[in-house]
Amino acid sequence: MGFGWQGSVSIAFTALAFVVMAADWVGPDVTFTVLLAFLTAFDGQIVTVAKAAAGYGNTGLLTVIFLYWVAEGITQTGGLELIMNFVLGRSRSVHWALARSMFPVMCLSAFLNNTPCVTFMIPILISWGRRCGVPIKKLLIPLSYASVLGGTCTSIGTSTNLVIVGLQDARYTKAKQLDQAKFQIFDIAPYGVPYALWGFVFILLTQAFLLPGNSSRYAKDLLIAVRVLPSSSVAKKKLKDSGLLQQSGFSVSGIYRDGKYLSKPDPNWVLEPNDILYAAGEFDVVEFVGEEFGLGLVNADAETSAERPFTTGEESVFTPTGGAPYQKLVQATIAPTSDLIGRTVREVSWQGRFGLIPVAIQRGNGREDGRLNDVVLAAGDVLILDTTPFYDEEREDSKNNFAGKVRAVKDGAAKEFVVGVKVKKSSEVVNKTVSAAGLRGIPGLFVLSVDRADGSSVEASDYLYKIQPDDTIWIATDIGAVGFLAKFPGLELVQQEQVDKTGTSILYRHLVQAAVSHKGPIVGKTVRDVRFRTLYNAAVVAVHREGARVPLKVQDIVLQGGDVLLISCHTNWADEHRHDKSFVLLQPVPDSSPPKRSRMVIGVLLATGMVLTQIVGGLKSREYIHLWPAAVLTSALMLLTGCMNADQARKAIYWDVYLTIAAAFGVSAALEGTGVAASFANGIISIGKNLHSDGAALIAIYIATAMLSELLTNNAAGAIMYPIAAIAGDALKISPKETSVAIMLGASAGFINPFSYQCNLMVYAAGNYSVREFAIIGAPFQIWLMIVAGFILCYMKEWHQVWIVSWICTAGIVLLPALYFLLPTKVQLRIDAFFDRVAQTLNPKLIIERRNSIRRQASRTGSDGTGSSDSPRALGVPKVITA
């Protein structure tokens, strides 16, 4: 290689940095910053301080930072949520749900940074998916992919594109060749649009057997015992009137009362407190229904008390009865070498050895009759277990007896607040059921009841009631769902009048959690007696009390030590009351600022105006104003008009992204200055010359960048690859724009690893995906787009034809389901059989799960239409043993 010790040092330590980041030992921002500092420590022989620091002032990078402000300003007004809720409409199939959700996101992310797009779209899609009956896991990975694909359509669509534009401007300004290298907003569109369309097509064609969401991540088709609590909304009701039989993915297969088990419960059976229902379904579905209807989970310890009278004391909803509320539920698999094999559940000292209590067991090939305590354990059994305070996943006993990692299924320590929201007359939820309004199925949010304007009350189990103006909906919510509820259009807090009387501007209003001190002056008094608003200039919205659900009316709650108050207040309130004796802990709630809907039109118009300056400049081939100052001025106007406040603007910037990109610029300068970039570029040049094709060289650039983006962040991959690609492109006399397009497309192609792209990471957490689920869809998607990119890069001069073919094929694929229903039934069955074979080949478990789902649905809608055929055998579930 043609470089000296400087190049060797650069390669060695850059490679070491790649290993550190790939192993996720240290974040890329810290890794690149330290690497850059090291490379400057050789008295300028590798890279000078001036060149190393140049990246921190790069115009492309500064543009990225200030576009975060613009996106935050629009998000704070709630404008994007209103637009997207209107565009999404309703859909009952996964195909149309993906078409409706992905295409608008692709269009939006072409002009807004994709990270903010994904941030505000996650709760919208979760609510919409539940409302339409579409699995959330089917929607969130495509959301991330759509935001990335849309970003490849314009030069401002992703931060990576802006970084490459900035690097290109800097490089060719010095070479006095900026005219042929300068990027306008739509210069990437001839190549990015077909790239995005074919990615969209792939998701539509493969969603049935590559996307997760056909089943829960945790144990499937469990038969779980749940107890009707005295406070349950289904107590004293007939089974058919309880609302339980209408729950999707949930069925009642049996009822246990007074020592007798009824395997085929009559729909007219009246449910009594302490009845044990055997509920078949996935755990997360059973858990959701349990929370909604007031059902307590029965574990192995509680099973032994099933023949004795139950206590009627206060019990927490859907926590294992017979003991203290659980900390969390976990899932574990019996290892082949476990000493538990051959022993019954009763014979194992679960609490003493593991700090765990069995709740349910899954075993394949049907269900074995018998009680949980009498089941003989076998290798491969999947257990759902309740944790005790003595549980420690690092115990050697756990490692020896459970295969793989013990995974959390449910965290029971989350605080629950009861929040009342009033329905506005103009609300879109009016004349809709709670489910149709999108208020059911949201993680951490459960509707308790509805108080009508005439003073009457409607229970949550009434699934036919349609919401009316001035209704008050009482909702149990954890802190994670509070932000979603605060921004739900058409609803306002019951305490809104008290909030408004504080005089705090909506621009500076947010929520704070405040834990009441046990010796504080407000203990033993009601919120009304304390005169909380007058004394603290803040309003109590809701109260959480450990182990109990407090009364609904906040003003009448007698405060106790340890209560956690949810307070609406000024953004400075927590700092001002940090040493107040009434509270022991004050913690702001993230993303809880109410939307400034009165500024919605202003925010959208300002952002549109900014984009139009770039579009007009591109059409006129003249830059009237650079995007960086345009973004700064737009943000300033948003601040002045009250779309957001200064604190929100500061917090909107992802400083780790800034540090990563800036340091990566310096590292790329070091690789170029030491000759390392030229040496790697020679390899690409050789490919192009040997194959006599510029397209081959561009494909090599794309693949190298795409692979690098799976290991690093997309921005860092683009910055590292740019000098290598630019040198190769200049040597082969390829247009600088074409070379940069290959890098832009490749750097955005981080689809396999959820940690390679910030958008992937966000949906990974929100959708509760596994790394394997990401890889199953991401790997073939990556290969598909490599093939697509290869065609696009080889036929860049004929982009018009590529466009036409891409649009025609996309339209055909989108409309394909409509054509399917026009075919004869025999042809439809043959098509179904073909895709079943394909799905079974790619994912053998999928067919079994799908058939079981069909059987469960059929059993719920038996000959009498009431679900009377529900029984463990009729469900077609795997061998599952529970209480």
Swiss-Prot record:
Positions in coiled-coil regions: none
One Pfam assignment: TrkA_C
Source superkingdom: Eukaryota
Residues in the signal sequence: none
Keywords (A to Z) from UniProt: Cell membrane, Membrane, Repeat, Stress response, Sulfate transport, Symport, Transmembrane, Transmembrane helix, Transport
Composition-biased stretches (Low complexity): 861-871
Membrane-protein topology: Multi-pass membrane protein
Region (Disordered): 857-883
Entry GO terms, CC: plasma membrane
PROSITE patterns xrefs: RCK_C
Any Gene Ontology biological process: potassium ion transport
GO MF annotation list: monoatomic cation transmembrane transporter activity; sulfate transmembrane transporter activity; symporter activity
Predominant subcellular localization, coarse grouping: membrane
UniProt domain RCK C-terminal: residue ranges: 211-295, 317-401, 406-491, 497-583
Subcellular location: Cell membrane
Membrane-traversing stretches: 3-23, 30-50, 60-80, 106-126, 139-159, 185-205, 600-620, 624-644, 657-677, 693-713, 774-794, 802-822
Reported consequences of knocking out the gene: No effect on sulfate uptake, due to the redundancy with SLT1 and SULTR2. Slt1 and slt2, as well as slt1 and sultr2 double mutants show a 50% decline in uptake while the slt1, slt2 and sultr2 triple mutant exhibits no increase in sulfate uptake capacity when deprived of sulfur. Modified regulation of the SLT3 gene that becomes up-regulated by sulfur deprivation instead of down-regulated as in wild-type.
Induction, as annotated: Up-regulated by sulfur deprivation.
Family annotation (SUPFAM superfamilies): TrkA C-terminal domain-like (SSF116726)
The UniProt record lists the keyword Cell membrane: yes
PANTHER family found in the cross-reference section: BASIC AMINO ACID ANTIPORTER YFCC-RELATED, RCK C-TERMINAL DOMAIN-CONTAINING PROTEIN
Family note: Belongs to the divalent anion:Na+ symporter (DASS) superfamily. Na+/sulfate symporter (TC 2.A.47.4) family.
Function of the molecule: Na(+)/sulfate cotransporter with a probable high-affinity for sulfate and a proteasome dependent turnover.
UniProt-recorded name of the protein: Sodium/sulfate cotransporter 2
Gene name of the record: SLT2
